[in-house]
Curated annotation (Swiss-Prot):
Protein name: pH-response regulator protein palI/RIM9
Cytoplasmic side: 1-3, 127-190, 240-346
PANTHER family for the chain: PROTEIN DCV1-RELATED
Native species: Candida albicans (strain SC5314 / ATCC MYA-2876)
Family: Belongs to the palI/RIM9 family.
Matching Pfam families: SUR7
TM annotation in the entry: 4-24, 106-126, 191-211, 219-239
Coiled coil: none
Amino acid sequence: MFKAFIALLILLIVCWVIQLLPVIAVPFTTPDANIYLSYYNNYKFGVFGICNVERHICSKPSIGYPSTNSTFYAYDNDESFGTGGIVLPSDVRYTISKLLVVHVVAFCFSSLLLIVIFGLIIILFFKYIKTKKDLEGIQLNDSSHEITIHSDEEDNNNNNIDNTNHNNKRASVTINKTIFDLTPFLNLMLVFTFFSVLTTLLAFLADILLFTPNLSYLGWLQLIPIVSMALVTSMLCFIKRSISSRKFFESEYRYANDDMRIMRKTYVDEFWNDNASDDGFYVYTDGFYTRNGDNVQQPTSNTAGSLLSEHHDVSIVEPRTFLDTDDSRRGSSPHEFIELQNLRPV
């Protein structure tokens, strides 16, 4: 279980880094940096603004690209702006650029998910250390009780054995009761992964809608968090299912509908017990040979020639040897058999 959470942590760190790149794109980085969602008409587009590559002028970070009355156009007077502000690669209006804020929402959900799983791993690590120390203490108590047992008398030995068994049972019960319940954390992680997948998918669709002819590598990289988050969701569901099944089978209480536990116990018993399906019926055979005492004869083939040559009026030959009706001898020797020969009538 601990290794599974570490694998999830590594996968989430990769997704978190990929989702961080669009958030820190231009205008937070310089225009010379290779972190942008699209490059079109000497302009680099990010989530919170745009930058002019030639003049090294960037807009102020804001949700949505600068409108027609923005001061950005006063510093960068370009005829390509027209009357509607900045021209996007897909020729859509600049107001649709506000959809890019979904990148930030997806990044926030991934950050929360990363914090939860990192905290869960730390808690499990400390719980493992504490449980290990408790088990070592129990083993030390057992060894000390064994030393005192050898030095006492027989009556005292019995009392000490009972006390040690009672203490061991109490210690094991307390350790079992302090087992950490992962279900609330798993439910919280499932909620975060679900919303992270939805928001990352919506952000990728917004990138395609705005920059579809000139979408950069950073936009296509957003497919990796989508697939990874879907994989993380499946793994979390599998872990939750395995934990709930283990708790159900290891529970000491009986339930009203306990068919699942009974079926599992029956299957395990039949799997480990070789005599589980034994009904007392034995079949002895020598393959395709006929044994008469110590003489072994191969059977004759019932061909048409042999049937014509060995023609009889009866179709069934009387058995040579019958099994004894005595119960004490029934099935005692594999040499006792009934030999029958099938003859076809002419």
